[in-house]
Amino acid sequence: LTLTITPMRWLTGINQLINYRRLIGLFAFFYGSLHFTTFFFFDHQFDFAAMWEDVRLRPYITAGFVAFVLMVPLALTSTTGWIRRLGGRKWNLLHRLIYITACAAVLHYYWKVSIKLPPTNPRNYAILVAVLLAFRLWRNFARKRASEV
């Protein structure tokens, strides 16, 4: 959902949407934290060794774990103070991890659901993420091309 804010702003011209991006990203981290805590508590009773074994052996758990771990620095550095401390360029570079995070989260969902059910819903999320990333790549390519002319 966070990845949709910038393309929606570009397409609609409603620049106020950017004000909600941080909040939506933090909600995503909150959801991921609850999801991880539930997994860690109910599936492993806070046993680190058992959890790590699960992360190591089950690909969908590995993908979910990667997505969660990558979200931690994004949430921690989401404040204006961290933007100033890191500098805009380094902060932007760090926050590009959201693209890998989104792909890992979709992969986690796809692998988990496809074990028991046809993967229709995860496929829709994968298509959405692919379209959003393609749109960003196309826009960046068009911008670079326009600046060269």
What are these regions (language model features)?
Residues 1-149:
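Membrane-embedded alpha-helical bundles that constitute the cytochrome b-like, heme-associated redox core
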